[in-house]
Amino acid sequence: METVGRPRGRPRGSKNKPKAPIFVTIDPPMSPYILEVPSGNDVVEALNRFCRGKAIGFCVLSGSGSVADVTLRQPSPAAPGSTITFHGKFDLLSVSATFLPPLPPTSLSPPVSNFFTVSLAGPQGKVIGGFVAGPLVAAGTVYFVATSFKNPSYHRLPATEEEQRNSAEGEEEGQSPPVSGGGGESMYVGGSDVIWDPNAKAPSPY
C-alpha cells in the first residue's frame, strides 16, 4: 500500500496574499489658515487664544477689514513704555504678527516674544502704524491669512566683535520698549482734525 506524505513548505500562493496597507499620518510642519473675527472682538486676543487652544505657533501674513481705537507703542526717542491711542475707525492695510507656541518645560525661552504690528488708513487717507500695545477691536468682520508652525529652533548667528560692541552700546543707550506698558497719550482722529488728550489713561496690556 502506497502512502502519500504531505508536501513540505507552505501551500502554493500563500506568500503572495495581499497585505493590508499601513498608513502613517504625519502632520505638516506648516498649515495655512483663514480666520474670521466678528465685529466687537479684540483681534489680538482672539488670535492669541486660538494659538493657545491648539498649542501652535502662528505667523499672520495679511489681514483685511476695519478696526477701532488702536493703541500703538511710540518709537524712540520716546520714553520706554510710552504709548499713543488713536480713536476712530481705521482700515487694515497690512499686518505682521507672530505668536510663539508653548515651549517644553526643559527648553530655554528664546529672547523674543509675541508681537503684532499694523499699518492702518484713517480718515482723509492718513496712514498710521506700529507695534500694537493694547486692544485692537474689530469695527466689522476682520479676516486674517496665517500659517501655523510647531517646535521652532532658535539659532544665534555669528557676529563680529564690532557688531557685538555696537549692539552692547545700543542696549546701554536704550532698548526698545515692551509691547505693553505705561503712560500713554491719546489722539482722536475725525475728518481732518487731530485732537490730543494729554490726560489719557494707560491702556491695559493684552
Curated annotation (Swiss-Prot):
Its main location: nucleus. Residues 5-17 bind DNA. It is found in: Nucleus. Residues 1-21, 160-206 are annotated as: Disordered. The keyword Calcium does not apply. The keyword Nucleus applies. Keywords: DNA-binding, Nucleus, Transcription, Transcription regulation. Transcription factor that specifically binds AT-rich DNA sequences related to the nuclear matrix attachment regions (MARs). This is AT-hook motif nuclear-localized protein 28. It comes from Arabidopsis thaliana (Mouse-ear cress).
